[in-house]
Amino acid sequence: MRKIRKNIATRQVIHIVGEGLTELFYFSHLKKLLGYRYSISPRLFENNSIEKIEKKIKELLDEDVFVICVFDDDVSRRSDAENRKMTALKKKYENNANVILCDSLQSIEYWFLLQFEDTCRHFQDSAATERALKQYLSTYDKTRKYLEKDKWVRDMLADSKIQKACELAEKYKGRDSYSEIYKAIQKVSE
C-alpha cells in the first residue's frame, strides 16, 4: 500500500545582505534574540558597493532565495554617479516580489532613533543622527567592539520599541528622514 504524503508548506529562505558592520550586527543580534529565521553572510556586509550588492541580489534570486537588502541612502547622495546607480537599483527591483530594499536616510541610526523618539526631522548627515541617538543610547559607538555585544539591541527591543518604530517608519515614509527597515522586520516576523 502506498504511503500518503501530506503537503507540507515549505518556507522560502530569506537572506539579508547589506553594506556595513552596523547592519550586520543589528540583524545578527535580532536573529539570536528574537529567533528570526534568515541567513546572513558576514563577508557581504563589509564595504559593499552598489554594484556588489546588485550582483549578490541577482545570485540569490537565481537560487530562489528571498532577498532583503539593507543600506544607508546617504551614500547615493554624495555623488550623481552613485545616485544614478541607486535609483537604477531601486527601479529594477521595485516590483520584484522576492526582493525588499530597505534604505534609510541618513543612516540606519535613524531607524534606531525611532525606537526611542517620534521624529521625522531632517538630519544634516549620519553624524547628526548618531548624536540624536546618543541621547538614548549614550554609549552607542560604531566600532566592532561595541557592535558585537548585543546590549545595545536589547535596549532597543525593551518595551516593544521595535513595533513602535515600525509604525513610525511607515508613517514617515518618503520624508526628509526615513527608514524602510520596518519592511524587513515585518517580513521576518511573518
What is each of the regions a protein language model found here?
Residues 2-11, 24-43, 54-66, 73-190:
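C-terminal accessory helical subdomains adjacent to catalytic cores in phosphodiester-
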Residues 46-50:
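Eukaryotic endosomal/vacuolar membrane-trafficking regulators centered on PX-domain-mediated PI3P pathways
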Residues 13-17:
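Conserved beta-strand elements of the Class I
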Residues 18, 71:
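Short beta-strand/turn micro-motifs composed of small residues
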